[in-house]
């Protein structure tokens, strides 16, 4: 078994798309750890709007200014991924009290699967507390302005998805 390293944090998510809220959380976590691994999950059951490789590239573009942040796509059980990168801390964001019940359940399950790893919850900066990838996708799909919620490269990717869907209709 791989030994967990408490100086390596893993921040998993679908990141469909990565938002300014995600970026803020990573930016605040990066100084706390030797390394932060952003694990971009395949998550086929969620039916992502953007393919895994594009989500990985967008996250790398948004987070590339952090020398201790690595973005990796994965399609395995989270516990296996965390062990493969020798993570010792699992980072999770809590935007609102409504997130807590789900995140508490996930933390409890992860404690059973990877007992050597601790889950650490971070709250977002106030200006990002209402941002979610699903809301961003829905607003973008309906032609709304999401420029205040995502980096420019993500905005462009969402525009292309919308145009492609419009062309199919």
Swiss-Prot record:
CDD domains recorded: PPAT (cd02163)
Cystine crosslinks: none
Gene3D superfamilies named in the record: HUPs
Binding-site positions, substrate: 14, 46, 78, 92
Superkingdom of origin organism: Bacteria
Entry's Gene Ontology cellular component terms: cytoplasm
InterPro entries for this protein: Cyt_trans-like, PPAT, Rossmann-like_a/b/a_fold
Record's keyword terms, sorted: ATP-binding, Coenzyme A biosynthesis, Cytoplasm, Magnesium, Nucleotide-binding, Nucleotidyltransferase, Transferase
Subcellular location: Cytoplasm
Molecular function as annotated in GO: ATP binding; pantetheine-phosphate adenylyltransferase activity
Catalytic function, reaction form: (R)-4'-phosphopantetheine + ATP + H(+) = 3'-dephospho-CoA + diphosphate
Cofactor entry: Mg(2+)
Sites marked Transition state stabilizer: 22
EC number: 2.7.7.3
Coiled-coil region(s): none
Nucleotide-binding is among the record's keywords: yes
Binding site for ATP: 14-15, 22, 93-95, 103, 128-134
Listed pathway(s): Cofactor biosynthesis; coenzyme A biosynthesis; CoA from (R)-pantothenate: step 4/5
Gene Ontology terms: biological process: coenzyme A biosynthetic process
Similarity comment: family membership: Belongs to the bacterial CoaD family.
HAMAP family from the UniProt entry: PPAT_bact
Name by which UniProt lists this protein: Phosphopantetheine adenylyltransferase
């Amino acid at each position: 078994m791989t030994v967990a390293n408490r100086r390596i944090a893993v921040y998993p998510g679908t990141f469909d798309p990565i938002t300014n809220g995600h970026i803020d959380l990573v930016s605040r976590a990066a100084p706390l750890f030797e390394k932060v691994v952003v694990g971009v999950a395949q998550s086929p059951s969620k039916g992502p709007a953007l393919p895994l490789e594009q989500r990985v590239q967008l996250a790398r573009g948004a987070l590339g200014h952090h020398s201790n942040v690595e973005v990796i796509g994965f399609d395995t059980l989270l516990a296996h991924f965390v062990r493969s990168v020798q993570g010792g801390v699992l980072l999770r964001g809590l935007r609102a009290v409504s997130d807590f019940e789900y995140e508490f359940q996930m933390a409890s399950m992860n404690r059973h699967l990877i007992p050597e790893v601790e889950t650490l919850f971070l709250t977002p900066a106030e200006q990002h507390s209402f941002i979610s990838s699903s809301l961003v996708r829905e607003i973008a799909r309906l032609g709304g302005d999401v420029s205040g919620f995502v980096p420019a490269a993500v905005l462009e990717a969402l525009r292309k998805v919308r145009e492609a869907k419009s062309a199919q209709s």
